[in-house]
Amino acid sequence: MEAALKKLNIALQEAIDSFEGPLNQERLNELQTTESLPNKEVWSLASQTIDLADKIIHRLQPPSLQLAESFLAYLDTKCLWAAVSHDIPDLITAGGPQTVQELAKKSGLQSIRLKQVMRVLHNNGIFEYKPTTQKYSNTPSSTLLAKDHWTQWHLWVDLYGNEHYKAAEGIPDAIREGQTRCAAQIQYDTDESMFRYFARNGLQEKFHKTLGAGAVAQAPGMMADYNWGELDDAVVLDIGGGGGDFITSLLREHPSMRGGLFELDSVIEMVRPKYRDASGEFADVGDRMVDLHVGDFRVEVPAYEVYTMKWCLHNWLDEDVVKILSAVRRAIKVTPRARMVVVESVLKDGRSSRIWRFGDLTMMAGANGQEREEEDWRGLAAKTGWNIHSISPLRNAWAAAIDLRPC
């Protein structure tokens, strides 16, 4: 065992050393930047490396520490929210590397307590700490958390570190036999769906703003890694399209494409000014949004040639997904390029895919929903008159593009 560990340590140190130097740092930056997409082969290899390294950790880490990392993980969440809510990433972005005392003074915090929070975060790779100067600087991860960063990931830290955090406390009760409420309904003491509850309690805009920001942040991979060019002049209906960020990204990427949005009445009411007002956020594509539809997509959808659904079917169990896919299949205008592109997670094992497993639990807790494995998607397609033409991984996105064609 000792010889194997020594050999492993040497190999790992050699690998770390091989990453040093300007040229290799440039390749590493390709994986970590949000300004461009990484090379596909490097991205795929990096995912394999992450999975292998995680297997080594699981083999070597004492069982009690494996348990502790799970039951103490809530501290990671709240430390991250503490830093974001007190603008620590923004202060470093504006002022460069700073000591904890400098950061505490600017943010009105206790330096000893901020130090405790920052110690957790920099050991998680969020912020960098240099002992020689005792200063903190931003890493590629913490840079994303600045309020003016185009990806707006700070919104996710807020929504998931607070509203979804509270919802998750209901998971133990939600999984009991006979329980019909999801975890969020238990914790918020309501029988309404979370979408209706959030709308009634002033949280709808926060919810859709957060998911919309995620769509924008992950749009480069969503746009590049599926062949949308085949649909350049199509009219695309985005079903359950939320705040409209995804269909807007598509229209901006493809100037000849036109679009529509299908949502709940409260969401369409919120979205309409974005497209129809001259100063609206999406006014630049407003003339290419042919309609904003209200309805229940489990029953009926308008007839289009092409449909998209992003991060929507995971809100529903199989019985309802069958209804939704069947409704779209009945409505679709069958042409050689007719299709429905579902942008959703495809569950699999391994560290590099764990964000999709977190998504699975989030859907369970918030909507009584679930993410799915590839065989699940194929089974649902076969039941509802579709063939899966392709499943395309999307770089830097928490989903794949599942291309359904009518059969």
Swiss-Prot record:
Factors inducing expression: Expression is regulated by the cluster-specific regulator verZ.
InterPro entries named among the record's database cross-references: COMT-like (IPR016461), O_MeTrfase_dom (IPR001077), Plant_O-MeTrfase_dimerisation (IPR012967), SAM-dependent_MTases_sf (IPR029063), WH-like_DNA-bd_sf (IPR036388), WH_DNA-bd_sf (IPR036390)
Residues engaged in binding S-adenosyl-L-methionine: 263, 295-297
Entry EC number(s): 2.1.1.-
Class of this enzyme: transferase
GO molecular function, one term: protein dimerization activity
GO terms, biological process: methylation; secondary metabolite biosynthetic process
Active site (catalytic residues): 314 (proton acceptor)
Pathway where it operates: Mycotoxin biosynthesis
Swiss-Prot/TrEMBL keywords: Methyltransferase, S-adenosyl-L-methionine, Transferase
Top-level taxon: Eukaryota
Phenotypic effect of disruption: Completely abolishes the 11'-deoxyverticillin A production.
Pfam families for the chain: Dimerisation, Methyltransf_2
Function: O-methyltransferase; part of the gene cluster that mediates the biosynthesis of 11'-deoxyverticillin A, one of the dimeric epipolythiodioxopiperazines (ETPs) from the verticillin family that act as mycotoxins. 11'-deoxyverticillin A is required for normal conidiation. The nonribosomal peptide synthetase verP is speculated to be responsible for condensation of amino acids to form the carbon skeleton of verticillin, whereas the cluster-specific tailoring enzymes are involved in further modifications leading to the production of 11'-deoxyverticillin A.
Family: Belongs to the class I-like SAM-binding methyltransferase superfamily. Cation-independent O-methyltransferase family.
Name of the protein in question: O-methyltransferase verK
Originating species: Clonostachys rogersoniana
